[in-house]
């Protein structure tokens, strides 16, 4: 799954569109599209995207023994 696909699935589930997500982030729709094309977001931006979608952002590592960090 690409970054664009992940964000677009979140947009669809939140029942908004790209322009509304951009507005909630304080970005222009053009900037959101550019960032979706590059697929490069900081952790803080991922947190903001999740908040704008009404979701929780989680990131971490799960090791073969089940340890999660």
Give the positions of each predicted feature.
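A short, Lys/Arg-rich alpha-helix, primarily the initiator
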Residues: 1-16
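Residues within the alpha-helical elements of helix-turn-helix
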Residues: 13, 24, 52
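Short alpha-helical "recognition helix" segments of helix-turn-helix
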Residues: 20-22
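Recognition helix of helix-turn-helix/homeodomain-like DNA-binding domains
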Residues: 26-41
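Short, basic-rich loop-to-helix N-cap that marks the start of a DNA-contacting helix
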Residues: 38-51
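Short C-terminal boundary/hinge segments that cap the last helix of small helical domains
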Residues: 54-69
